[in-house]
UniProtKB/Swiss-Prot annotation:
Protein's recorded name: Succinate--CoA ligase [ADP-forming] subunit beta
EC supergroup of this enzyme: ligase
GO cellular component annotations of the record: cytosol; succinate-CoA ligase complex
Keyword annotations: ATP-binding, Ligase, Magnesium, Metal-binding, Nucleotide-binding, Tricarboxylic acid cycle
Gene3D superfamilies: ATP-grasp fold, A domain, ATP-grasp fold, B domain, Succinyl-CoA synthetase domains
Subunit and partners: Heterotetramer of two alpha and two beta subunits.
Biological process terms in GO annotation: succinyl-CoA metabolic process; tricarboxylic acid cycle
The organism's taxonomic lineage, starting at the top: Bacteria, Pseudomonadati, Myxococcota, Myxococcia, Myxococcales
Function: Succinyl-CoA synthetase functions in the citric acid cycle (TCA), coupling the hydrolysis of succinyl-CoA to the synthesis of either ATP or GTP and thus represents the only step of substrate-level phosphorylation in the TCA. The beta subunit provides nucleotide specificity of the enzyme and binds the substrate succinate, while the binding sites for coenzyme A and phosphate are found in the alpha subunit.
Protein species of origin: Anaeromyxobacter dehalogenans (strain 2CP-C)
Amino acid sequence: MKIHEYQAKEILRKFGVAVPRGYLAVTPLEAEGAARQLGGGISAVKAQIHAGGRGKGGGVKLARSPDEARQHAEAMLGMMLKTPQTGPEGQEVRKVYVEEGCRIARELYLGMTLDREIGRLAVMASVEGGVDIEEVAAKHPDKILREWISPLTGLMPFQARRLAFGLGLSGDSVTAFVRFATGLYNAYVATDASLAEINPLVITVGGEVLALDAKMNFDDNALYRHPDIAAMRDPDEEDPKETQAKEYDLSYIALDGDIGCMVNGAGLAMATMDVIKLSGGQPANFLDVGGGADEDKVTAAFKIILSDPHVKAVLVNIFGGIMKCDVIANGIVAAAKQVGLSIPLVVRLEGTNVELGKEILAHSELKIIPADDLGEAARKAVQAARAA
């Protein structure tokens, strides 16, 4: 689960992480009032959406007066903010965060996430703050400092100091950085976060270490332990299809292609997407209906796929083990009839009750394109999407 910058800073504040003062605003007048509360000097007006790169898209502006803060908020609220992470449609800005300005001496990067190759939490730091860290890692991997944390000891002071020295810090700034990194680590662990990222982490002219921006993601499977964090979910920032999928316990991720996919099993779903790509097509989604789906769940999955206007063809790839092919077939028929299927549908079934499933589809009066293996199914789906 993702949350907004202002929410992440609210959490980090509780763990002693230094963040600038700021106030949320949902109207231009509220933004003006927030700037006045901050003293009426220089402030930053920041669009709150679940995406990075806001500054490049016009989503972060400096205001030198409360009146200017109101003007910036007026321009931002309601705009479709486009960044490299939003896609071409952009995301609507519904709220802004007005934050006090500070005199910046240096911009750095500090982040924490799980290194799945090693099976440990990795703390990463870089002198290249305020820019796309993925780009830095790709072009200048030597500029990324890393420390791997033992779950038995947690982040040790010597590790935080080693990062600070690697960033070129000295004197009181080292002490402040160690305190900052320790607070960030404590917040990460205590909240079951999957990502905690400060970009940029700034060193002010006065030597303070501040989180100028903050991003936190959380493990959905641990949210039952954190009702306060679960309450921070913003449905307006989530894809409606993904929200609907969660209601039916479906694993769905929207992508940019035009071939809808419905598969049982995450591994088979990823393999299906790979074969579609190898066949010259682009998958429109990842969708795993799981091993114990019933007809209603399959129907819901089918409707979610078809609700994407970019989908030109659908590929259903089912290997029936616990999931029976006849259940999938009945769900396909029910959903196709309910939504009035008008795009090509390619179905590949194999496994338990496969003959019964094929018979159900054959007698459904639907224009279904059958396939006997995954390669054939992918090729037919790509051809159908191109012809649509």
